[in-house]
Amino acid sequence: GCHVHFLSRLPSPKIIMQALSEVKPKIVIAVPLVIEKIYKSKVKPVLEKEGIKFLMKVPGLDQIVLNKVRTELINAFGGEFIEVIIGGAAFNKEVEAFFKRMNFPFTVGYGMTECAPIITYDDWKDEKLYSCGKAAPNMEVRIDSSDPSKVPGEIQVKGAIVVLGYYKNGDAT
């Protein structure tokens, strides 16, 4: 079985990191802001040190630094998780590219409350950079646009997990 843990205080990087080290979750589900705060408070200060900046420019040594940062970040997330699932807003491209570069086990999904909530997802090993995955099982997804190359379209979803309507609220349905 699984347990769901909620913070009882407003999240700050310190409070989040403390909770993760105590709970040692198997799966972490978070909004991008939380992950970005952890990156800015834990990872970025290390990467901005002059010696580290130099090492990151040297082929081979850069990978040693990335592996060390990855290990430290995994331990900061409790050390026992399978992957971090990020969703609820756009993920910072700089942070996403860095996490991908160091092979950090994360994935970005897309969903909405009306779809209970996952629409797209992919295993972190298969996820493409700047993607939010593939359609979840038994979901059909399409983008409806008058001119797909020039006009942003509407995301349309069909599947068994899409709600039929809002409970006792026909006007909102």
Name every feature range the model reports, one short phrase each:
Residues 28, 65-173:
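Conserved AMP-binding/adenylate-forming
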Residues 1-72:
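Conserved AMP-binding/adenylation subdomain of ANL enzymes
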